[in-house]
């Protein structure tokens, strides 16, 4: 019987991996945005020697990261953001459909990267508190960290502090708790955001 190498066996045995990314082509586009399109340019089934596709997409389709440039004129582009924002200790919190203020987060576990599962809206006091605690990334299962009626204020507050915004996550099968997050965006110079493949890793043994 073939056995896995110790390296591969170690990865699967000691860690549980959650894919928290939505499929880029299947995720519901933000209202007003064109859906992504994947077009075959060369096809082996047509007798060519290889397959090659062309992708046309908004930088904010599917699971993606917002850089400061998205809402701040002279803010950093996605390629200039520190990779340390996207890798490291993380906590997943299920939140109620109410305004989330500083007091709410004072009573919850903290990590430099926080993923919010639910419809709650961040308040100015919460954003200031989390930044002062050392938060570098806020994520959400929603299409946007803001609300449809007020996209500007939450984005400007977070991105003004240099906090990365990770949106459109798939968190339905992820229990609340502590994880290691890996969510580096594509490196695209001059872009105000980019898609990413986000995963969470826990020390729980995978069954």
Task: Set out the residue ranges of the language-model regions.
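Active-/binding-site microenvironments in catalytic and ligand-binding cores
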Residues: 5-207
């Amino acid at each position: 019987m073939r056995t896995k190498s110790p390296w591969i066996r170690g990865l699967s045995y000691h860690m549980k991996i959650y894919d928290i990314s939505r499929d880029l082509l299947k995720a519901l586009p933000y209202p007003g945005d064109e859906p992504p399109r994947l077009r075959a340019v060369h096809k082996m089934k047509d007798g060519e020697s290889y397959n090659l596709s062309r992708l046309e997409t908004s930088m904010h389709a599917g699971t993606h990261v917002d850089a400061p440039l998205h809402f701040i004129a002279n803010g950093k582009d996605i390629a200039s953001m520190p990779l340390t924002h996207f890798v490291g200790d993380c906590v997943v919190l299920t939140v109620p459909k109410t305004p989330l203020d500083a007091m709410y987060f004072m009573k919850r576990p903290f990590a430099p990267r926080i993923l919010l599962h639910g419809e709650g809206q961040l308040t100015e006091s919460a954003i200031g508190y989390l930044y002062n605690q050392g938060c570098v990334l806020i994520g959400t299962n929603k299409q946007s960290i803001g609300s449809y009626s007020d996209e500007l204020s939450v984005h400007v507050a977070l991105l003004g502090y240099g906090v990365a915004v990770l949106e459109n996550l798939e968190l339905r099968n992820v229990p609340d708790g502590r994880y290691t997050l890996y969510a580096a965006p594509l490196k695209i110079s001059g872009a105000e955001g980019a898609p990413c493949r986000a995963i969470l890793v826990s020390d729980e043994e995978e069954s």
